[in-house]
C-alpha cells in the first residue's frame, strides 16, 4: 500500500469543507451504526478524531459531553468551529495525538483512520488518550469497497481511480490487540447518474489517491461509457462500501 501524503489528504478535505455535509450520506449511516454498537454509554468527555465539519462533535456536545474536535484539515476545523460544534479544537494527526494520556471517556473516529499510514499506530494513539473504563469507537473502509466504481472505470481506462483499503482479516487482526468487538457491514448508496456518484466522493474529500492521480478531465464520451458500464438498480447508479466498525475497551 502506498504511504499516505497527509498534507495532500488535508488539502483535499479542506477543499471539500463547505460542501461536505451535503454529500456525507455514508458518514451519517456509519455514525448511526457505530452509535448503535456503543449502546447506552453516556461519555462525559469525547474526542472526535477526524471530526470533519463537526456534525458528530455537535451531536456529542448536545448530548452533554465536553468535546474536543480534532482534524488534520484546518478548513474542516474552522467549519466545525463556525458551527460551535465543540468546546475545544485541535489540528493534529491521529497517529501522533498531542493530547494527555487518559483524558477522554470516548475516542470517537468515524471514517477517518483509513487516511492513516498505520492503523495499529492510530488505534494505539486513540487508546492512549482514553481513561480506564472508556472506549475507542471507530469505523473505516475495508477492501471490497466501491466495486461499481472500479467496474465502470474498466470501460474507460486501466488506471486506479479509488484507493485500495485494508482487508477485513488485516483489520480484525489489528483490533484483536485489545479487548473489544468488531464487525463489517455493506452500505450501498444510490445516485441519479455516474457523475453524481463520483461527485459524492469528491464532495467528501475522498478523491485523493495515495499513489497519485491523473488530473485529465473526463470527455463526454468517457462519461457516457462510465454511465453505461456502471452497475445500476432501478435506473440509479450504486456505490457499495464495506464498512468495518470496532469498539475497543480501555481496561
UniProtKB/Swiss-Prot annotation:
Please list every transmembrane segment annotated in the UniProt record, as residue ranges. none
Entry keyword Hydrolase: no
Which GO biological process categories is it annotated with?
biotin biosynthetic process; methylation
Please state what class of enzyme this protein is: transferase
- Give the E.C. number(s): 2.1.1.197
Recorded catalytic activity of this chain's protein: malonyl-[ACP] + S-adenosyl-L-methionine = malonyl-[ACP] methyl ester + S-adenosyl-L-homocysteine
Pathway it acts in? Cofactor biosynthesis; biotin biosynthesis
Alphabetically list the UniProt keywords.
Answer: Biotin biosynthesis, Methyltransferase, S-adenosyl-L-methionine, Transferase
- A GO term, aspect molecular function: malonyl-CoA methyltransferase activity
Pfam families assigned to the protein according to its UniProt record, in alphabetical order: Methyltransf_11
NCBIfam families, from UniProt?
BioC (TIGR02072), PRK10258.1 (NF007610)
* Family to which this protein belongs: Belongs to the methyltransferase superfamily.
What the protein does comes down to: Converts the free carboxyl group of a malonyl-thioester to its methyl ester by transfer of a methyl group from S-adenosyl-L-methionine (SAM). It allows to synthesize pimeloyl-ACP via the fatty acid synthetic pathway.
Q: Report the protein name in the record.
A: Malonyl-[acyl-carrier protein] O-methyltransferase
* Species this protein is from: Pseudescherichia vulneris
The gene it comes from is: bioC
Amino acid at each position: 500500500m502506498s504511504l499516505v501524503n497527509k498534507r495532500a489528504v488535508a488539502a483535499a478535505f479542506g477543499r471539500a469543507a463547505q460542501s461536505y455535509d451535503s454529500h456525507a450520506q455514508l458518514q451519517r449511516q456509519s455514525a448511526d451504526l457505530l452509535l448503535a454498537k456503543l449502546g447506552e454509554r453516556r461519555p462525559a468527555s469525547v474526542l472526535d478524531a477526524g471530526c470533519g465539519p463537526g456534525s458528530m462533535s455537535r451531536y456529542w456536545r448536545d448530548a452533554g459531553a465536553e468535546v474536543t474536535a480534532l482534524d488534520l484539515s484546518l478548513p474542516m476545523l474552522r467549519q466545525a468551529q463556525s458551527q460551535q460544534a465543540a468546546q475545544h479544537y485541535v489540528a493534529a494527526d491521529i497517529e501522533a495525538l498531542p493530547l494527555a494520556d487518559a483524558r477522554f471517556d470516548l475516542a470517537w473516529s468515524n471514517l477517518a483512520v483509513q487516511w492513516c499510514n498505520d492503523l495499529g499506530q492510530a488505534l494505539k494513539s486513540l487508546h492512549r488518550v482514553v481513561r480506564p473504563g472508556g472506549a475507542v469507537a471507530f469505523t473505516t473502509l475495508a477492501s471490497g469497497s466501491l466495486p461499481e466504481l472500479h467496474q465502470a472505470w474498466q470501460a474507460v481506462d486501466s488506471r486506479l481511480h479509488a484507493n485500495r483499503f485494508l482487508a477485513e482479516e488485516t483489520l480484525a487482526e489489528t483490533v484483536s490487540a485489545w479487548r473489544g468487538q468488531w464487525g463489517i457491514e455493506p452500505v450501498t448508496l444510490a445516485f441519479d447518474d455516474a457523475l453524481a456518484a463520483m461527485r459524492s466522493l469528491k464532495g467528501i474529500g475522498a478523491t485523493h489517491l495515495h499513489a497519485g492521480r491523473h488530473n485529465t478531465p473526463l470527455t463526454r464520451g468517457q462519461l457516457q461509457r462510465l454511465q453505461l458500464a456502471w452497475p445500476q438498480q432501478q435506473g440509479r447508479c450504486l456505490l457499495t462500501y464495506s464498512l468495518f466498525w470496532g469498539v475497543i475497551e480501555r481496561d
